[in-house]
Every structure is written in C-alpha cells, then in structure tokens.
C-alpha cells in the first residue's frame, strides 16, 4: 500500500507523543510502512492520519543515545530543507522550515554533547514539529526518495541515510 488517501476506514482520535525529535509525525498526515520481506518502504499520505493533539515533552527524549539524537535531528533538518526548496512551498512553509533549521543548528550539538540538556531537547522537538508542518504542505524530495530505498534495501537508519545524502543532493 502506498500513495494518497489510502485509509479506507474511520480512524480513532489520534494523539501523538514523540519520543525522538526528528520525524515530525506529530503534525504530519504521512505514515511510512516497511516491508522486511520485500525490502520496501512506502509512504501513505492521508489527512485522517494527522494527529489531533500532540504533546512535546523533552523529558521523553533524555535517554536517547547520541547516535539516535543526531540522526533523528538530521531527519528533521532534511524535512526542513526539502520543504524550503520544494516546488510546493508557500510563505508559511518557508517560515516554518527556516524556524526549524535555525533551532536545529542552535541545538543539535548541545543535545549530542549533553543528553540531559532539557532546553536544547525541547528546542529540537519544536524544530521537528516546525519541519513536520513545513513538509506536510511542501513535501519532501530526492533525499527522502533515496533514503527510503536505502533503508528498505539495506536497513540503514532513515536519519543517517538523510544525513549522508543531503549534501550531495544540495
């Protein structure tokens, strides 16, 4: 299953509580489904998947190891960059993408070096949220297309694949 408007049944009220600062899932209408048998990762986009409420609690991210913190942060950065340069962006998505990018650059090293820095962790969650808002309207691009294939085929973590590919696509 992949594509637009694929949810055929009524969904329950969705609340999102992210435990990493990267996917932006708490504000998007996208879901990614991995099939380990076929080594595919497919995206579904449907407005019914967008959470109605989100709680951004930085305490839930404190125990993350540095490599998860950095790669999920790079996922958020990639969302913001791809939304900013995408063809479907508008002024509001550009603003959200810029806010996300600024927050990520100001905080990603801080949380990598000090996992208990609550203020930096909160800022990374907010950045991920803004990036999610931006790419929900403007979509992602080539970086994610390649990263999804690498993740599906070879099990490479999504944020790591984004981090490696982003400079080459830019």
Name the predicted role of every residue range.
Residues 20, 80, 169:
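Active-site pre-Tyr helix/loop in NAD(P)-dependent dehydrogenases
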């Amino acid at each position: 299953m992949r594509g637009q408007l694929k949810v055929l049944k009524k969904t329950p009220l969705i609340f999102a509580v992210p435990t990493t600062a990267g996917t932006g899932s708490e504000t998007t209408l996208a879901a990614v489904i991995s099939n380990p048998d076929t080594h595919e990762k497919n995206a579904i986009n449907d407005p019914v998947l967008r959470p109605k409420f989100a709680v951004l609690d930085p305490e839930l991210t404190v125990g993350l190891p540095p490599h998860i913190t950095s790669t999920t942060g790079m996922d958020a950065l990639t969302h913001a960059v791809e939304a900013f340069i995408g063809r479907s962006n508008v002024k509001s998505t550009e603003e959200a993408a810029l806010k996300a990018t600024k927050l990520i650059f100001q905080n990603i090293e801080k949380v990598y070096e000090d996992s208990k820095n609550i203020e930096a962790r909160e800022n990374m969650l907010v950045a991920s949220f803004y990036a999610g808002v931006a790419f929900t309207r403007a979509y992602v691009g080539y970086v994610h297309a390649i990263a999804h294939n690498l993740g599906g085929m070879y099990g490479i973590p999504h944020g790591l694949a984004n981090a490696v590919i982003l400079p080459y696509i830019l």
